[in-house]
Amino acid sequence: MSSSVWQERRHGEDKQRRNDHRSPFQRDRARILHSAAFRRLQAKTQVLGVGMNDFYRTRLTHSLEVSQIGTGIAAQLSRKYPEHKPLLGSMSLLESLCLAHDIGHPPFGHGGEVALNYMMRHHGGFEGNGQTFRILSKLEPYTEAFGMNLCRRTMLGILKYPASQSLLFVAGSHPEITNHRQLKPSQWPPVKGIFDDDSDIFDWVLEPLSVADRARFTSVQPSLQPNYPHLRTQFKSFDCSIMELADDIAYAVHDLEDAIVMGIVTASQWQQDVAPTLKHSGDPWIRQELADIGTKLFSHEHHLRKDAIGTLVNGFVTAIIINDDPAFEEPLLRFNASLEPEFANALNVLKQLVFKYVIRKPEIQMLEYKGQQIVMGLFEAFASDPERLLPLNTQERWRTSEQQGQNSHRVLADYISGMTDEFAGRLYQQLFSPKAGSNVELSKEM
């Protein structure tokens, strides 16, 4: 398929701007960087709650680091596989994907996501990646009705889970609860896919694919995770595979750094959970360079810790390879980036360390639970009387959705998922706390 079809935008543009020689993907990057949805990431939880410390990452700084790692991966692959330089294309494209990858995630991290998914359980569900797709293509007001109106290839690259929610959902897998406070995230995992409300955009993105490619690309299978009841997609595009690797590396390495600096992960935990696996790795570089890196990671000398972090990132970035799946005709689907097996295992060990000692830490879970309750409380309030409680512009969207017979509950999810942690907390106080002040300070943000 020619590259021009992947540079097409859903809504034709005739912008004649003076001396503007930017490529289509440079324009995409600019639209993402200058969007309100991207700015809001500065006040959304990454792993550690916003306000706990002024050192750790927010979703904004995480996204910037993912972008840097993503372009580093592309540069390495370009040198390692010169025959694939045309496929790698524009660095601006990969920057766009990495900068935008978390743009749809709601306030309070996973707690907010599970809460919205539960409140939307009869209305198509909620999932952060699906919301990212929706913001880029419909909600962000760069255009009247086409969101940021990004290139088709950019939209293909943001598709981490290329199948509709209804195709992936397995009914009867959720226990009913009688009280919101009893909601367990493990029992209500979001379906990882595109909302059915956005099927028109999904179809447009996949339009250039052959019938066989589309069928295979959107195929689903049972999940390999024992506690995940829904079906899962199997494939992603080449650009998406690079973005996802960059995200995984940033999560495993940089979120680990935050936890080390804040004293949440200790040297003894590293020696117990990570060092043995690295020392027995089948890769000699991992055995020699990473097995003893814990000394630097937990050093009180900041420059030694930063050197260790750099070594980890470099090790993973340079261990990425390109795989060929000839069952696909379209090169953007045929080729995918992945980590060499021993490095994939090492990265997984780091991710499990973060999950075990950071994500599952009771103090972190209490913050997540609190955010979960805030989001459900807000949704319940707005759903009870949308034309009374929603801000005026959101009321108008809700009314239009009702009049056109669309899913008006999706408008509520759009509004709440766009909030920052702080704004959602303040709005909750305004609605439910007798001691809260007036709504004046909230009005400008609505």
From Swiss-Prot:
Keywords, alphabetical: Hydrolase
Biased composition (Basic and acidic residues): 7-28
GO molecular function: dGTPase activity
Highest rank taxon of the organism: Bacteria
Start and end residues of each stretch annotated as Disordered: 1-28
Biological process (GO), any one: dGTP catabolic process
Occurrences of domain HD (ranges): 59-252
Stated family: Belongs to the dGTPase family. Type 2 subfamily.
Name assigned to this protein: Deoxyguanosinetriphosphate triphosphohydrolase-like protein
Provenance organism: Shewanella sp. (strain ANA-3)
